[in-house]
C-alpha cells in the first residue's frame, strides 16, 4: 500500500515536471544549452551559419541558371566560352567574402539583443542578401546602358 502511494506520488511529480518543461518550451541542445524550441538558433555560430548557408545556396540558385545560359549561348565563341566558369566562381566567391561578414553582422545583432533566431528568419536574411546583391547588380548594368 505504501509502495502504491509512493509510485503514485512519483508519477504526479513526473507529470508535473513534464507539464512544466512543456510550458516553458525549452529543448536541451547538443551542447547542453537551452533554446526556445528545436528550430531556434540561439548561439552566434548557429545563427551565423544558418544565414551564411542560405546566402550561399541562394547565390548558387541565381548564378547556376545564368552560367548554363551563358554556356549554351557562348559555347562556339573563341574566348567567351569560359565566361560560365567566371559566373559560377562569382556565385561562390561573392558569398564567401561578402556573405561571411554580413551574416556575422546579422548574427551579432541578434546575439547582442539577446534574441534567438528561427530557421525561417535565417532563410529570409540569407536569401535577402542574395536578392539585394542581384538587384544592385541589375541596377548597375542598367545604369551603363
Curated annotation (Swiss-Prot):
Subcellular location(s) per record: Endoplasmic reticulum membrane; Nucleus envelope
GO biological processes: endoplasmic reticulum tubular network organization
Topology, Lumenal side: 1-50, 103-117
Membrane topology: Multi-pass membrane protein
Transmembrane domains' residue ranges: 51-71, 82-102, 118-138
GO cellular component: endoplasmic reticulum membrane; nuclear envelope
Keyword Glycosyltransferase assigned: no
A Pfam family hit: Tmemb_170
Function: May regulate membrane morphogenesis in the endoplasmic reticulum (ER) by promoting ER sheet formation at the expense of ER tubules.
Name under which the protein is recorded: Transmembrane protein 170A
Species of the source: Danio rerio (Zebrafish)
Gene: tmem170a
